């Protein structure tokens, strides 16, 4: 039943002869609950959501009142967030849809109504994560890679296609269309929804969650959204809210404008560095100030995209005139654009730089005119390097101690060379710092016509000067939508990119997520034989160790323009601002400034070729634009027929033996330590997305099931099969488990025998005798992708608790939703400080009385009988997380609730 507050807030406005209902935030000010003009715009969007969806059960007056007091009472309370839609990509989307199919089967098995297992909000899945760069630097690369993609993934695509027929409210955008976040920005996002609610046309803000951490990109157009784990997204699809504490909102005041030579990429990398230093994990970031009006929407989207890299839940740009201009540019309906403006102005959510600034938790100032051309690396996006310092910083990193900013090698590394004899008879020499991969990739940048056309102009000037890319550099161009192909073609710049080897290889994430494909065999052999430190330069958003290619140890993020420039140089061991890139056809040195376009040149090109007609043409038949997809043969049966022999799609074991009622929270006793890790362990480390080695537990499983090595595909592509994924948990070739000294990769010591073995093998031995497991970790545990399998795999290995110094937001949430207890060391304490070496038996004194952020007693019993006692913080961040944990996970809770209805 709706409350008095909600009823009083219900208002109407008229537009073009049509009446619209909306829930007026000003009502809260009239009732003395909030000063709306002082609230950050992102908080206004959340407040509208709880006001409109208040039902006096899940969302109550107390939630409205708590959020209305933002900034006045230490932000106490929690937000039940029910987004208006959900987006998925195929790597995380397949396991989400598998879980829905499994939930439906479980419902059927106990005699329940399977129609209760249907998305209750619109769901769009965009297939973008599976294409790999096998073929490149040739005109046929796109077709060859797409053909291989369908061959490798036919069974997965058949399953996803089946789901479009089996589930309501579910659509799939076919392969070779684009990258989910770019498709979302250019086409899917409405900015304001109009839906029929109780017979009334009701207007409200577009909001979403997505199963990819870079879902945050959509905040660039003023749509509030962020990445969640697949499990949380599934709960959202089924009508369950996400709960989180009322966030702090850090305001970033932008002034002035970007100078000549700097790009949106440079700004995004600078913002990432500044906000990482500030510490914004779990917080909202909102951009305001006079500099905002100097940022085209595409630049805002680039900055918003990298919110996971700066650690924030989102980086929000409120809707303003520039947002409407972008909607018009991308072919959105004129009447709808008019509605967006009218509604947001009526409801105090339309940004105007002339209005008074909101009151933020804290404010950071950033002068856009101070942004310099930059890269970041070699192993983390927040490690900013000015272009002018790149040569010096690279050389320093080679001999710096092994870690986030060093490789731990000695000076002799600079004397190494690898001689390459190509199959065509030509030869080349690679040395330390040479570039093996140069990729224009990722929605972070390919959604931005300014940097993409800028890269095309760099290529044009380079070709005209007679510059060429060395033969050992693997070049690729993988845009996030077909619109990019259209404007590069129409501008005449694609031919120059082609001349340098940046041919179109596919529409998808490719190199940015580790789908860079193989290097030439002769290069791989030479680099491996010499153990040469080679590099990559990519226009992506992540460069974590081991992510881009197993043989490439140093990876640098840069703008598409700099990717082209570095590809031409062939090395990162160069001062591009002062040293020549190469010699032109006239024999003269060519410098970066000789091939760099002016801001005006780029802007004029964008104005000329980026048109609404282009967007309308490319998106007019978006769900059926791929003939190979349309021809997939699928059944329309509502229950999926799991094939026991499939190595891609299996019915997971999460619901096996599920009781009708949840159990009680009980102490954890005599756990053994399976992993002890340092800082910055990423979800890539925990659950890799890339290649499956033949000698790994996952590789052996596939061989045992008659899968040839060439058909292994990647971990990411096999996320619908829990048997592969549990074997791949903690299996990244670069992860360093301190319990298996002298090894790199997924190994541990099995304490009963002292034997070093694969983590999966040890976990299964522990499971046989009923021993639970624990993981010890440092700061920022679980940073990176919103990879639910990092938590699912942890659960299936038998890990009962993780004890870390700090967590990245999404992974902590995912652990709880998989029934794994996240504990946090007290400030100043760590495994090392407490003297824990991993050989201990760990017990945790937790019970039904536990509350969010309580302290619990942890006991560590050493081999000699010595006892170490310490207190750890229970990282349940809301009351509902207690229920998730009690049920053994959120999906188990959803199933029990649906059965009880």
From Swiss-Prot:
Gene: acnA
SUPFAM superfamilies for this protein: Aconitase iron-sulfur domain, LeuD/IlvD-like
Keywords: Iron, Iron-sulfur, Lyase, Metal-binding, RNA-binding, Tricarboxylic acid cycle
Domain of life: Bacteria
Provenance organism: Staphylococcus epidermidis (strain ATCC 35984 / DSM 28319 / BCRC 17069 / CCUG 31568 / BM 3577 / RP62A)
Protein name as it appears in the record: Aconitate hydratase A
Cofactor note: Binds 1 [4Fe-4S] cluster per subunit.
The enzyme's E.C. designation: 4.2.1.3, 4.2.1.99
Required cofactor names: [4Fe-4S] cluster
Origin organism lineage: Bacteria, Bacillati, Bacillota, Bacilli, Bacillales
